[in-house]
């Protein structure tokens, strides 16, 4: 297969994994587009994206326009004369003129099985909703939000102990292989594009800190899903004794209870059991203000007085 001349557009670490795979392949990455450097850290020093750092280390030209809507930026991209543009978590809207510029158009690596979970947070929403599987879709980009024709899909079962952090890692391994496979199919003309079924489409809204507050009136199963979805960000939490306590790990208990939602049923080294709107949730790992995440056994040693049975955890902001 003849090597393709590729423009790569991406910004975070997830994108950098895909760029690395392209660099390692026989294809030519002729240019990289990434978001402008942003202030980061305590000193608010201007920091390059992971994609830019990788590109610079391989002497690949880097472009960082604030927008691709203006003609000079579009002409600059067209002058690169690329066969295809690969887009992974870039963060800028690509207007139609840009989508139509490369010979084979623009393709995108998306972290869900489309048309389910279009949008910004597909990995987190799959966990939040209790989906049993997720995966990667390579699609031909159009002007809509993740609405383009699907070129290739790979599947990944979601395990009970998966969090957004672990799924991110698994998909960051699966995505590059799927991308290389799709590029081979496109170059050889062996891929058949499949239209998305609009009736099955839904949107993965961005997560918010407000949404991470545990509402004990929900079911234990839903809360267990949320804790996994919001790990590592924004991290589920509840308010108690005037403090915000983060919850990193839970499981659904087999204990039954008629207690009011938010009531502690039992507290032991094995976990703190809390009544919910439906079922009982066992808290296994938590984080007190200013401390590291700890097992419940360690939390009870430090603050056992906060978590005595029949105490009602206050999920309203103080």
Swiss-Prot record:
Pfam families: Formyl_trans_C (PF02911), Formyl_trans_N (PF00551). GO terms for molecular function: methionyl-tRNA formyltransferase activity. It catalyses: L-methionyl-tRNA(fMet) + (6R)-10-formyltetrahydrofolate = N-formyl-L-methionyl-tRNA(fMet) + (6S)-5,6,7,8-tetrahydrofolate + H(+). Keywords: Protein biosynthesis, Transferase. Transmembrane segments: none annotated. InterPro entries: Fmt (IPR005794), Formyl_trans_C (IPR005793), Formyl_trans_C_sf (IPR037022), Formyl_transf_N (IPR002376), Formyl_transf_N_sf (IPR036477), Formyl_transferase-like_C_sf (IPR011034), GART_AS (IPR001555), Met-tRNA-FMT_C (IPR044135). (6S)-5,6,7,8-tetrahydrofolate binds at residues 112-115. The keyword Oxidoreductase does not apply. Belongs to the Fmt family. This is Methionyl-tRNA formyltransferase. The gene is fmt.
